[in-house]
Amino acid sequence: MRTPAVSIIVPCHNGGRFLDGLVASVAAQTFRDFETIIVDDGSTDPATLEKLDALDPEIRVVHQENRYLPGARNRGFREARAAFVIPVDCDDRLEPSFLAETIEVLREAPPEVGFVFTHGRLTGALEGVMSRHFNPFDQLFLNQLPYGMLLRKSAWQSVGGYDETMRDGMEDWEFSIRLLRAGLRGIEIPKPLLIYNVSAEGMLMGHAARMHGTLWRHIRERHREIYRLAALLKIWRGSAPGKISLLEAAGLLGLAKLLPETWFNKLFYEALNRARRRRAERGDYRPDGGLRRNSNSAD
């Protein structure tokens, strides 16, 4: 069996209503040497199961019991035959040049570059362009990276995959910190080539957003060594100036120790909302990442 250059892996749990858009965007890719793997993560919705059964035979569908998003992504990576892998959700879409542009960069990059990512175009409850950047120091406090990035499969293997205990979200954030700790870095393509559907119940605005502080605390506990002062100073000195100052980082770490979890989580969530409102005020579809709420959304 021929080995493709890229594997596109798609976790799907009762998300059949979104698959037509994703499949159409995959079929429109200008780079053609890829395979598509959909991981049915214990779907129970009859319409989703019917949709999966009716897909083109060239799309490989693997079934498993519900292991949530990190477990489904790990299954997709294990099934992937290519050296380069992109995980996307079933309600996402890719611009036609996504694979062509990202694989060209990653193929030519040195081995320490483990991933390539693009900016995102948001649709649904939020609309606009979300800029994405990789600053190692900021990444310890803010989830800057999209989950939909082209990775070397060897990078996923080297850090042990996604943490399957993180069932409430932000597993991609914790995964990116392990990539950072492994000495891997990413390259940004400053174009919105990933189309990300935002729902009021989704990760960006829903449960995971409300638990942002709690999930960050989990990440910090898992990676205590990198959040110690000496390690933080080393990463801060090696990073370009970013969104988080050293003083702000120290303040967050101090508050996380002093405040009860519910208080800290509320503070963290409100800070994120203020930042989001500031971005929304900057306008719609702007290169600097302006966002606006879609009044026609179900939100």
Model-derived regions, located:
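Acidic donor-binding segment of Leloir-type glycosyltransferases
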Residues: V23-H63
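N-proximal low-complexity "stem/linker" segments adjacent to membrane-targeting elements
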Residues: M1-S25
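Acidic donor-binding loop at a coil-to-helix junction in glycosyltransferase catalytic cores
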Residues: D168-F175
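Conserved donor NDP-sugar-binding/catalytic core segment of glycosyltransferases
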Residues: S97-V129
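Glycine-rich, basic loop-to-helix element that forms the pyrophosphate-binding segment
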Residues: Q64-A80
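Cell-envelope/extracellular polymer assembly enzymes that use nucleotide-activated donors
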Residues: P4-S7, E35, E174
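Nucleotide-sugar-dependent glycosyltransferase catalytic core
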Residues: M130-Q139, R167-D168, L184, E188-E221
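Short aromatic/hydrophobic "clamp" motif used to bind/position activated sugar donors
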Residues: V85
